[in-house]
């Protein structure tokens, strides 16, 4: 890039049309007017421009309750710093940015502030927010509307294919754009002046990167997976098809794509930062692996030695691929469930097993684990749960998507009857395989059980991240006057 002096890696050779349109339309160094001074109330001003004049806000005794009841969102210090880092980069001529922020630290709220900043100050007319899962489309639109609806319109592209261009923020799965090359057939390179990729290193595969590079303008990547997460792994010993090697290459490619070849993102806020600042909870790990499962998942596998009926020595090696088929016996599954129930954290106000997620190897395995847990619940808590103690939430179960919403809202199969003044879900455990990972927001989860091997670092971080958010359980009291009783 001889004009801006800020070269970037591209996924394919650009067409003449793209280059000409970029020259005419996208000029990050154009003369700018007065730029907003971004403060921590940048989003709150969109939600309620005159909030400072409200008597309930002026009165310090009622201010917190006023902000909470009106759901006013103020940027935390690190979120504010992330926005300012982007602003600094723009002033220096940077066009690509990468935010590395731990799960639960508010990447979407930070993105909302960044989107507002771009739309107000830097000639950006429309923003494309790319996700890689259907449920994240709806969630992103909901979160953007909660804080920006007074200023900007947010739509999901596949629901507004005819009038999407009336909106300032368009949310879509990258798969929708890839299908039949829709991104080329329907859109011009200049239709989006800012493209944001959520969980960038996972969503920007080879094909999806073409979508990302097709549009001219600013580019922002979001990720919760730090690049150095695999630094302790012997890279030389990994095969090309090893999930860790594939993920390592994706991470490196992602940092390069966003101009971070040094390995340093535009802004970083880790899990440890969040714990230190009091925003996140560091998980307590209970390791329930046996010697056999540890060997089974090792590079060499588990070597089984015995003798047959004729007295001949038998030696057989079992590896990762045998984990489910040959080692998930009834006895093993029961041991898993017993260990979980013995160590699971309890709800602070009902004493029940805290709300939990269990990740299984397959849908068949999830069915079995659910069945065993409900059998134990019947023994331990007769007539309390009616087989609703644990529920299978997988793609094969009708209404599973709604189940995830009900569980987060504490309404799955009704309410717990343990405390009439306190609201929590009757169902205590959701048993799943791949659902309820990325982007699933359920702050009162107390236990995450991984009853399967997990080879992808980003999957592990996302699963673990479901349980790192802080929760004030007092907020779930229907009648808070009963709290001290």
Feature locations, PLM:
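Conserved helix-turn-beta segment of the N-terminal RecA-like "Helicase ATP-binding" lobe
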Residues: 134-158, 372-381
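Interdomain helical connector at the RecA1-RecA2 junction of SF1/SF2 helicase-like NTPases
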Residues: 235-354
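SF2 helicase catalytic motif II
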Residues: 185-221, 225-228
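Conserved helicase motor
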Residues: 134, 155-163, 173-179, 205, ...
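Conserved C-terminal RecA-like helicase domain
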Residues: 168, 316-432
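Conserved RecA-like P-loop NTPase helicase motor core
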Residues: 194, 391-485
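Conserved RecA-like ASCE P-loop NTPase motor core of nucleic-acid helicases/translocases
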Residues: 99, 124-133, 354-362
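ATP-dependent helicase/translocase motor core
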Residues: 1-126, 135, 139-150, 165-169, ...
